Amino acid sequence: MNAVITSLVFISLVGVGYSWRYPRNADQTFWAFRTCQRQSEGAKSLREWYRWNLPNDEDTHCYVKCVWLHLGLYNEQNKSLRVDRIMEQFNSRSVAIPGGINTISGPTDGTCKDIYDKTINFFNNNVNDLRTAFYGIKKLSDEWFTQNSNTKPKGTKISDFCNAENREKGGADCQHACSAYYYRLVDEDNEPIHFRNLNILGITDEQFASCVKASKNKQGCKVADTMYNCVEKHNSQALKILDNQSPTY
C-alpha cells in the first residue's frame, strides 16, 4: 500500500507525459541499456541481457519494461508501446520494419510481466534487426561515437567532458547544463526526466519529484541547473557516484 501511495504522489507532482525526439542516437540507447542493467546488478540473468537474451524470469520482465521506458518507447498514460516511434527508429537506420510489429500495439496492464509477454515474441523474432536499429551491436555503436565527437565519448567521465570547452554553460550563462543532461536529470530539451530512478544512489522518488517541482517555472538550461543543484542538495554523493560510473554509464 505504501508503494502505491508513493507512486501516486510522485505522479501527481511530476505528471506522466514526456516526448523525446526520435530517432534516438547511440549515446541515448547506450545509456538506456546500461542504466537498466545497473538497476538490476544482482539479477541472475544480467549476463544474458548483455547478450540480448531475455529469459522468462521476474528480473528480466522488469528489465524489459525498464528498457522500453528509458528508450522513450513506453507510454505510461495508456500503458502501451509507441509503435510509431519504433518504426521511425527502424527507418532511420535503414532497417526494414518487421512484419509483426503490430503485435506489440495496444494497451497492457502496466506490469513488468504483461509488457514482457506483449513484446517477447516480437523481440525474439527480430533481435538482430532490433540490435541494429538501436545500436545494440558494439561495432555500430562505436562507429556512431567516432562520427559524433561532440558527444561524450565512451570511457570518459561526465565531469571531464563537461568541464571542457565551456560545455556546462549550455550556450548561455548556466552552470550545469552539460552534466545535468549526461546524468539524465533532464533530456535533450531540458525537460526533467520524471521517471529517473536514483533510489540506489540515495535519492528517493519524493526527493526527485521535489526537484522536478522546483524546476517547473524555469526555462532552458536553468531547468538543468535547478535539477542538478536540487539533487546535489539532497545527497551530495549521488552525482559523484554517477560520475564515477559514467565512463560506462
Swiss-Prot record:
Keywords: Disulfide bond, Hemostasis impairing toxin, Platelet aggregation inhibiting toxin, Secreted, Signal, Toxin. Residues 1-19 form the signal peptide. GO terms for molecular function: odorant binding; toxin activity. It holds the Pfam family PBP_GOBP. Thromboxane A2 binds at residues 49, 63, 154. It comes from the Eukaryota. GO terms for cellular component: extracellular space. Modulates blood feeding of female sandflies on vertebrate species by binding and sequestering different mediators involved in the host response. Binds leukotriene C4, leukotriene D4, leukotriene E4 and U-46619, a stable analog of thromboxane A2. Does not bind histamine or serotonin. Inhibits platelet aggregation induced by low concentrations of collagen in thromboxane A2-dependent manner. Belongs to the PBP/GOBP family. This is Long form salivary protein D7L. The gene is D7L.
